[in-house]
UniProtKB/Swiss-Prot annotation:
Region (Protease): 1124-1350
GO molecular function, one term: RNA-directed RNA polymerase activity
Nucleotidyltransferase listed as a keyword: yes
Name this protein carries in UniProt: Replicase polyprotein
UniProt-listed CDD domains: Dicistroviridae_RdRp (cd23194)
Domain RdRp catalytic: 1638-1772
Keyword set, alphabetical order: ATP-binding, Hydrolase, Nucleotide-binding, Nucleotidyltransferase, Protease, RNA-directed RNA polymerase, Thiol protease, Transferase, Viral RNA replication
E.C. code: 2.7.7.48, 3.4.22.-
Residue stretches making up the SF3 helicase domain: 513-692
Length: 1906
């Protein structure tokens, strides 16, 4: 059995792509495509079945596997034993001869097990799709299918050892050789096949214009060159094969072309007559060449000459109006643009660019080459090599096909479209087929009308409709039939109007329509005529969660209900004609024609308010009523006659609760609903999906399961319905199937129709009965004689005379008579004399005759039927009308056939098409431009600002306003002078007239500036007709109802700015410039698509068109020496420069090579040029560094790469780099990227490119702002080509001129235009030596599209814009000049390696005076060794020293990256220790009340401290006279739960669910404490940070249970939190530290805050989530909360900055988090020490898992004590631990700093200190004591806090000092207790309340040991 292992052919790969597809995907192809595939891949249908179905044989099943479900660990642990891993060997042996042998063994050794039926299971052998196809190709599947014994065929294929003793590889050898099985999957195979196919096809693509570029990154390509050299020999065989193919291909091509010419010449004369197409093509090409080669000034004249020459030659008999041609020759000044040279540039970006230039000369040359080959059998090429030959053949093939396609398209365009338009609109013609269909439908309709009314039309043509109406009104379905008939008549009427038929053709229709309308008016209950109450429609409301398939259920339900209203199957199939989809955003009911069903999808999505009501609610009330409802139509002729007549209204929405604010009685909306149903899905048809809005997994309809289970692409089976009362919300029926729900809908629909019909009957009867009700009052009056005489006529009876018409006799045709006789009906026919004869009697007489005799007699019979004269009248009308119509059709068709237009159109087709391409017709037909009004956002007169009125803009409500909009304009002009007051700042009028403007402007001169708002947007101003268009003013407001500025785009100039500030330099009387440019003056115009939350949602606003370019009418020109757009500068300095990093490659020797720039756009996700990915390998390490010296070094393999693609899935020259959380989070920039609306706003603009460049002079990176005043956007693809780096496609981007250089790629392109709100247009990707540069356009949607591929926990958002003041004036950064962080003044950064954010509007108050003071015994006990720390800035050597900045610098350190593998291994080991002893009572999220007040679940879940600071911003609202949080939670006693804090907590939690950080500002505060005198003199004051109380409460809710668990299991879990040093906890600690022997060390970390490693810290949230195990939603919340700890934002003075790694001391998890770092770090250090020692000495290497066998630790924060065994003490001791910690970035030192500078490798327990206490064993009481250091004890009495009474404070400290002395030896207690007592007695004259040595010991025993 020979298998093919060489690379597969392209044909095989192409067919394999389809063979390996799903069955349903295969059948989605067209019929022709499927036949071609089957022909290429299969022999017959039997083989197709074989390739797509499992092969069942005796004893086993052969099947195809899609994807291996095993994980990587199962692949690594491979066991080479038959029984355990034979299956893997079978799979690995594909395409090997041993495969059948292994299959046989696998079946033999397969363990026999029984299924649930007790039958033995059959082994399944899986093969890959490619090997399955190979088995099919070799005939194995066919043999297997027909074999009787599978053992025989397998032995035959594998080769019997006796008959074929050749060497066979053993199973174990194969298994060892292939020890890890390759994973295969459908996706991988399809991708590889598609890549191969794309590569082959790509070689045949048209050659684009190539721009040679140099990538602006610095890369090395030596390795790539070597690879190319080593693989070049592989192309030899390919070239040989190609030569042989070409030898066969060229003769075949020539033969094909010869056949084409022969065939074409035969049909040419028949198609084109005497005209030669070859001559036409040659003339056209000659004409174009003449024009192309003409001088620029003569191009138009040359074109005119060639056009006249062609017209004279081919169409000389046609008269042509040449006025435009004369105008062309006289005034044309613009020639065809033929000046499009190829540009040779040097790309300055790291990607090549491709540009397609459609130049006329290139087009003409291509056509000439193609035609020369096709018609003249010439093949022009130069000997450019075999590769060029192949490419040329591909070009010629496509060119030939392109000529054919062009001919087809042009002819179709002329004959099918242009002729049709000309005939219809000019000649009044119509296509024959369409006319036939129209006439046939018209005839059928006339027959129906005649059957209805024909027998009731009298001889005068009057219709007696009363009896007809009486019969119809008895049947509801008959009423519906009449209504459908009437609708059909309206449709025919519209067709007649569209066809513009002559009057003679419409007489018959109008006659029938008149009678039908008369009947329909009488029976109408739909309300179409508005003459009576209409049929009340049934209102069905479907609601349910998103993804339930409500819209999918709407269509079947609408069709079922529509079918109930129809009786014609054809009408039912054309269901879309009777279903109308209503969109309330469209103001008009366009195309509404009385459809039976109206659907309102996504009902109630628009927000409803009294000021901006949602029209859906009022519309529903109107449509669901019985009163006639005229609809708002766009066309005037439709307004008067279009009324709502639908029978069913179906609404769908996501929620049941609708917030209705615009109705005075909101229940009126719900009362209109007849059936309200919640749509759900059956479980078997659903799947679980992640909902970002809900922040959790939700159940949604799985369309794949629906198709799989039901077999249909759509079904109603998955739906179940719960019925809900729409008013009360009560559920009254549940679990209804669709059919049950449909029955209720049908019943309700029928009931509504019956009730409406009965109501009309009642009203008519009621009107008749009450006719004389008004005259009853006359009965009380006396009657006169004359009245009595008149009453004598009361006996006269009023009757309706029934006019009897004479019926006419109509002869029955023989065929009709035979049909009547065969049916043997009871009908009566008449002889000529009028004698009645029954059909049954005729049938009886003819029954005995044979068929031929019967037919002969029937043909001789003459019988008649009586027909009403009205019926005959209508028949004659119809006959005459049809006759006229047929004659008219014949005339029209003959006219078209005989008209020479067909011949002319073939000639003109090609000419018109080419002239269209070059834009000739657009120029020729252009006339004078329509005079449109000048569009402006505003008009500024200097004192008055005129704005258009918008309901969304209600800012004026906050000003003193005068609203005159509801007054008539003449009344406004009459009273405005008297109504205007000095306090009025805003005036609202219906229209601005010259008088009103003059009056308001005069008033403004004496008061202040006034905003004039007009409802009418058109006005005349200074002789110009102006239209005011709405600008996006609310883009600058957080809430449209307020004037609070929205700093999203850093705008500082709002309406307040206009009112309060005075104008500066003005160059024109119309314009005023505010002090910054981001005001409402230069806002972009409202666009059609409303995306932003503050954009208008009304239909009128949405309908406005967006201009393609920024219009300059609203630009304010001023004389200021500053940036054109201050907003752009602030965006760059405040945001872009903090997020912009230089990406560098780290060499093996540690040197760095700068590559390019990267911009963090969200969290730790960076946007970079796409070509970066191709030049880095997984073994590389990169370093990123920003302007502020923030540095991160990360392995490239740990960075996730996500391509940025456009809406069509095409990759852009950009990539998102998702860094590990080790890289700090950055502020969100996504909102500053352009959106689709802003992209369409500009074609040319001014831009700035901020770049980072290395300065050799300064030896660091500096920033430079490069400017360009002209940037052009393009939307065609460019290929960026770099000779050394390859090609990259730039699909959409920008081109500009800038002095860019290598390394500038990746810098963001910022638009420096005030009109553009979204400033970032893209990233720079290339440049050339001439200064041309190119940028890839990146929009918000591009980024969001890429974010969908990244886990939500990796894209946590942080937006600090709304919390800071960006309106402060900043120093101007000059362009093209280097600058560093010291040149930026928007933030006073404490140190480099921190990230600046901005400034607060005003700094926070901080006390600068200490609260510590000397006590009464100060200096009388011992020498003073401490003093209060410095709390304010000081002057040293004439310079001011900022104490905070000085002490915060220790946090500004770089930390190393810890590998994921090491971190994960340490985490798993720590988890097993920390999570011991869990209690379910603690594994829950605390409530808001429990987080504040505590609960009884644990003693460690205590109440919050009400005396500590509430944090920012709460500190600003602190109630005077209260301390800390007491103003919100009460001062003492029971806690008060404040509502404002509760709302803040809820908001924080909700944001965290959505992956958004609510800003937490940690306030840096100098700690008021005593420190050693030498440290105070060195200005070392510790800084602590407190956070907002709503964050602390939220953090306690989600973490406090876990922290309580740690405290309950203290010491045994390595954590000392909660340890009581006076209790048995100290004994327990000693036992823990002596577990591994006597050797211990105690150390602490220097600058611990600066060395914190985020790689370790972020795992703390994972550990807490493991403890709670309460779902992904809460897990995400904990990650978001913890990120505010290790990537914290701080306030220092008035400046706000971010730390790259942090641990604010005020967070509730400070100590547990530090303990976690200790436990994780020591395990990593253990492995590092072991590896180093093993490598040096060749000894056994211990792994991290051995840590718990040899080491025992306890830690409290950054303080720890380590006990280790003798076995590891040689390489795991104080010395080696210190060295290993340095690799992790920590500085670990001996706790006692060593004596004489020497640090021992280990100590004993008695020699170390922990928590500033020693370990002393009391031999008398057999316990371990924890004596405090003597220096600390003796220093305590010297100081006290200012809040206490000085004497009381001294006494308390002295007593505490003596109590601490009792834990030392007794002699120490006796000595110093006396000294302290005497000093206090001498100072105060009082005695201390103290106990004896034994007394204190007894007290500790009673309190803590019992």
């Amino acid at each position: 059995m020979n298998f093919t292992k060489q690379p597969a052919s392209l044909k095989y790969l192409s067919s394999m792509k389809l063979i390996t597809s799903q069955d349903q995907d295969f059948f989605n192809f067209g019929e022709v495509s499927r036949e071609f595939i089957l022909e290429q891949a299969y022999v017959n249908g039997y083989d197709f079945h074989m390739l797509h179905q499992d092969m069942n044989c005796i004893g086993f099943v052969l099947s195809i596997f899609d994807e291996d479900a095993r994980d990587e660990y199962e692949y690594k642990d491979l066991n080479c034993e038959y029984h355990e891993n034979l299956f893997d060997a079978v799979v690995d042996s594909e395409f090997d001869k041993i495969w059948p042998h292994l299959v046989l063994k696998y079946i033999t050794y397969y363990p026999c097990s029984l299924n649930w039926r007790g039958m033995p299971t059959i082994p399944i052998v899986y093969v890959s799709k490619h090997f399955w196809y190979e088995l099919y190709r070799t005939g194995f599947l066919n043999k297997l299918y027909h074999c009787g014994s599978w053992t025989d065929i397998l032995l035959l294929l594998s080769g019997d050892v006796e008959t074929n003793p050749g060497p066979v590889e053993t199973y174990k050898d194969l298994c060892r050789r292939k020890n890890i099985r390759k994973r295969k999957s459908r996706i991988r195979e399809e991708i590889k096949m598609q890549q191969h196919i794309d590569k082959i096809i790509g070689q045949e693509n048209e050659e684009y214009k190539i721009i040679n570029v140099n990538m602006q990154g610095i890369f090395s390509f030596n390795e790539e060159k070597e690879i190319i050299k080593s693989t070049a020999w592989k192309f030899n065989s390919t070239l040989d094969k190609t030569n042989s193919i070409i030898d066969n291909l060229i003769p075949q091509l020539e033969e094909t072309l010869a056949g084409f010419r022969k065939t074409y010449s035969k049909c040419e004369s028949k198609i084109f007559g005497t005209i030669s197409v070859v001559d036409v093509c040659v003339d056209l090409i000659s004409a174009l060449l003449q024009v192309s080669f003409a001088k620029p000034a003569m191009k138009i004249a040359s074109l005119a000459v060639e056009v006249f020459r062609l017209i004279k030659k081919y169409v000389s008999n046609i008269n042509i109006n040449i006025d435009k041609i004369k105008e062309l020759l006289s005034y044309g000044k613009v020639a065809l643009n033929n000046n499009n040279p190829i540009i040779h540039v040097t790309m300055q970006s790291n990607s090549p660019i491709l540009e397609v230039l459609l130049q006329p000369n290139i087009i003409v040359s291509a056509i000439f080459i193609a035609l020369s080959v096709v018609f003249h059998k010439k093949f022009t090429y130069k000997k450019l090599g075999i590769e060029a030959m192949i490419k040329r053949l591909g070009d010629l093939g496509r060119a030939a096909k392109g000529c054919s396609d062009l001919n087809v398209v042009l002819n179709q365009a002329i004959t099918n479209h242009m002729l049709e338009h000309f005939g219809k609109n000019v000649l009044g013609l119509k296509q024959e087929d369409e006319l036939k269909v129209l006439v046939e439908g018209y005839r059928n309709w006339c027959d129906e009308v005649r059957d209805l009314v024909g027998h009731k039309i009298n001889s005068d043509g009057e219709l007696d409709s009363k009896s007809i109406v009486e019969n119809i009104m008895k049947d509801v379905y008959e009423i519906q039939r009449i209504e459908n008939m009437y609708k059909k008549g309206l449709e025919i009427s519209r067709n007649i109007a569209e066809l513009k038929l002559p009057t003679k053709l419409t007489i018959s229709f109008n006659t029938h329509m008149r009678y039908l309308t008369e009947v329909f008016k009488s029976v109408d209950t739909s309300g179409a005529f508005g003459n009576k109450p209409r049929t009340q429609p049934i209102v069905i409301w479907l609601f349910g969660e998103s993804g339930r398939g409500k819209s999918g259920m709407t269509w079947p339900l609408a069709i079922d209900l529509n079918n109930s209203l129809l009786d014609n199957v054809d009408e039912m199939r054309n269901f879309s004609k009777n279903i109308y989809m209503r969109n309330v955003e469209q103001e008009f009911w366009d195309n509404y024609q009385g459809q039976n069903i109206v659907c309102x999808d996504d009902f109630g999505q628009m927000r409803d308010s009294s000021s901006n009501p949602n029209p859906e609610f009022m519309e529903l009330i109107r449509t669901a009523n019985i009163a006639p409802y005229p609809l708002h139509m766009a066309h005037l002729e439709d307004k008067r006659k279009t009324k709502f007549t639908s029978k069913v209204i179906i609404m769908t929405s996501n929620v049941f609760e609708q917030d209705v604010n615009s109705l005075t009685f909101p229940d009126a909306f719900r009362r209109r609903v007849d059936l309200c149903a919640e749509v759900k899905n059956k479980d078997e048809f659903t799947k679980m999906c992640w909902s970002k809005s809900a922040g959790k997994m939700v159940q949604r309809l799985d369309k794949g399961k629906v198709k799989k289970i039901t077999g249909d692409i759509h079904s109603t089976v998955p739906y179940i319905v719960d019925l809900i009362d729409p008013e009360s919300g009560e559920v009254y029926k549940t679990g209804l199937e669709y059919e049950e729900f449909l029955d209720m809908c049908l019943e309700k629909t029928s009931q509504c129709r019956d009730d409406s019909a009965k109501l009309n009957d009642f009203l008519m009867d009621y009107a008749e009965k009450r006719a004389n009700r008004s005259r009853e009052i006359d009965e009380v009056c006396a009657r006169t004689m004359d009245e009595a005489f008149v009453d004598a006529y009361d006996d006269v009876i009023d009757v309706n005379m029934q006019i009897e018409t004479v019926d006419e006799m109509e002869l029955i045709e023989p065929n009709k008579l035979r049909e009547m006789i065969e049916q043997c009906s009871n009908k009566i026919v008449y002889t000529y004399e009028g004698i009645a004869v029954k059909i049954t009697s005729l049938a009886f007489k003819l029954a005995t005759l044979n068929y031929e005799e019967q037919w002969e007699q029937i043909k001789e019979m003459k019988y008649y039927v009586k027909v009403s004269s009205g019926v005959n009248y209508l028949k004659r009308v119809l006959s005459q009308g049809m006759k006229v119509c047929e004659e008219w059709m014949k005339e029209m068709i003959n006219y078209v056939k005989e008209h020479p237009w067909m011949t002319v159109s073939l000639i003109l087709g090609t000419l018109i098409g080419i002239l269209t391409v070059v834009g000739f017709w657009k120029w020729l037909c252009s006339g004078d431009k329509k005079k449109n009004p000048i569009k402006r956002h505003f008009i500024n007169t200097g004192n008055v600002l005129i704005l258009p009125d918008r309901e969304l803009n209600t800012f004026w409500k906050n000003q003193e306003s005068l609203d005159l909009r509801d007054m008539y304009i003449n009344r406004v002009e009459e009273h405005i002078i008297s109504l205007l007051k000095l306090q009025h700042k805003v005036v609202l009028v219906p229209k601005v007239t010259k008088y009103i403007l003059t009056t308001v402007e005069n008033h403004a001169k004496i008061s202040d500036k006034i905003i004039l708002i007009t409802r009418n947007r058109y006005l005349n101003y200074q002789g110009k007709f102006v239209e005011l268009i709405c600008g996006e003013i609310n883009q600058f407001f957080i809430d449209p109802e307020t004037l609070d500025t929205n700093v999203e785009a850093f705008a500082s100039a709002d309406l307040k700015t206009f009112v309060q500030r005075k104008p500066i330099v003005i160059e024109g009387p119309e314009f005023v410039e505010a002090q910054t440019s981001g005001d409402q003056i230069t806002l972009r115009k409202q666009t059609q698509k409303v995306i932003e939350a503050f954009a208008s949602s009304d239909a009128i606003t949405m309908a406005r068109k967006t201009p393609k370019f920024v219009e300059s009418d609203d630009v304010v020109e001023v004389s200021m020496q500053m940036w054109k757009d201050q907003v752009a500068q602030k965006l760059i300095t405040n945001r872009v420069l903090t997020n912009l990093y230089k990406i560098c490659l780290v060499k093996e020797n540690g040197d760095m090579v700068p590559l390019l720039n990267g911009l963090f756009v969200r969290s730790n996700i960076m946007l970079a040029p796409g070509h970066l990915v191709g030049f880095l390998s997984d073994s590389d390490t990169i370093e990123i560094r920003n302007l502020f010296d923030v540095v991160f070094r990360v392995p490239w393999k740990d960075v996730k790469k996500v391509d940025v693609v456009n809406a069509f899935g095409e990759s852009k020259e950009a990539v998102l780099l998702c860094f590990p959380k080790f890289v700090c989070q950055h502020t969100d920039l996504v909102k500053h990227f352009q959106d689709s609306e802003s992209m369409s706003k500009f074609k040319r603009c001014e831009v700035t490119l901020p770049v980072l460049r290395y300065s050799d002079k300064m030896n660091r990176f500096l920033a430079t702002l490069i400017e360009c005043d002209k940037v052009e956007a393009y939307d065609r693809p460019y290929t960026l080509n770099d000779s050394s780096k390859g090609q990259y496609i730039l699909r959409q981007g920008l081109e500009y001129t800038m002095p860019t250089t290598n390394g500038d790629c990746g810098a963001p392109l910022v638009i420096n235009e005030t009109q553009v709100i979204r400033k970032i247009a893209g990233i720079h990707v290339a440049g050339d030596a001439r200064g041309k540069a190119y940028a890839e356009s990146i929009s918000q949607k591009d980024l969001i599209r890429a974010f969908s591929k990244i886990d939500v926990s990796m894209q946590i958002q942080l937006d600090l814009d709304q919390t800071l003041n960006f309106n402060q004036q900043q120093x101007i950064i000059p362009p093209n000049a280097e600058f560093g962080p010291e040149d930026l003044d928007f933030c006073d950064l404490p140190s480099l390696k921190m990230i600046p954010v901005g400034r607060l509007s005003e700094p926070l108050f901080e006390p600068g005076k200490t609260d510590i003071r000397p006590s009464l015994v100060y200096g009388k006990i011992s020498e003073i060794k401490t003093k209060p720390a410095i709390l304010r800035n000081v002057i040293v050597d004439g310079k001011i020293v900022n104490i905070k900045h000085k002490n915060l610098k220790k946090c500004a350190m770089d930390t190393p990256y810890v590998s994921k593998e090491m971190t994960e291994e340490a985490f798993q080991l720590v988890k097993s220790v920390w999570l011991k002893g869990m209690r379910n009572e603690l594994k829950k999220v605390l409530t808001y009340e429990e987080a504040i007040c505590g609960n009884d679940s644990s003693e460690f879940i205590s109440a919050i401290n009400r005396s500590s600071s509430p944090g920012f911003p709460w500190i600003r609202d602190r109630i005077k006279g209260t301390k800390g949080k007491q103003g919100w939670f009460g001062a003492e006693g029971e806690y008060i739960l404040d509502e404002d804090v509760f709302e803040a907590v809820k908001t924080r939690i909700q944001n965290a669910k959505n992956g958004v950080r609510t800003p937490v500002m940690w306030v840096d505060t100098l700690k008021d404490e005593r420190r050693p005198i030498e440290k105070v003199d060195q200005l070392k004051t510790r800084v602590f940070s407190n956070g907002p109380m709503d964050f602390s409460i939220t953090f306690r809710m989600y973490y406090l249970g876990f922290i309580a668990h740690l405290m309950e299991n203290r010491i045994t879990n390595e954590v000392s939190i909660g340890t009581n040093v006076y209790s048995q906890d100290w004994n327990k600690t000693v036992r823990k530290l002596k577990t591994m022997g006597p050797k211990v060390i105690a150390g602490d970390f220097s600058t611990f805050d600066g060395s914190l490693n985020v790689c370790i810290m972020e795992k703390f949230a994972d550990l807490a989530n493991e403890f709670y195990d309460d779902g992904s939603e809460n897990a995400l919340i904990r990650h978001v909360l913890l990120m505010d700890v290790y990537n914290s934002t701080h306030i220092c003075g008035d400046s706000v900055y971010m730390m790259t790694h942090s641990q604010p001391s005020g967070n509730p998890a400070t100590t547990p988090l530090n303990c976690f770092i200790n436990s994780m770090g020591l395990r990593m250090v253990f492995e590092l020490c072991s590896k180093k020692y093993s490598a040096l000495n060749g000894t056994k290497c211990y792994v991290m898992k051995d840590f718990s066998k040899h080491v025992s630790i306890v830690s409290y924060g950054d303080d720890n004590v380590i006990n280790f065994s003798d076995e590891v003490s040689e390489w795991f001791n104080m010395e080696t631990i210190t060295e290993a910690f340095e690799k992790l970035g920590f500085t670990y030192t001996d706790e006692l700093k060593g004596k004489n500078g020497e640090v021992p490798k280990w100590r004993t327990i008695e020699d170390v200190q922990y928590l500033k206490r020693k370990f002393r064993y009391d031999s008398k009481r057999k316990v371990w004591e924890a004596p405090l250091c003597m220096d600390t004890i003796l220093e305590m009495p010297n100081w006290c806090r200012g809040s206490l009474d000085i004497q009381e404070g001294t006494k308390v400290n002295c007593e505490n000092a003596i109590m601490e002395l009792s834990m030392h030896e007794e002699y120490v207690f006796d000595k110093w207790s006396k000294v302290i007592s005497k000093a206090y007695q001498k100072a105060t004259g009082d005695c201390l309340d103290i106990s004896t040595y034994n007394g204190y010991a007894q007290e500790r025993f009673l309190n803590y040991y019992l």
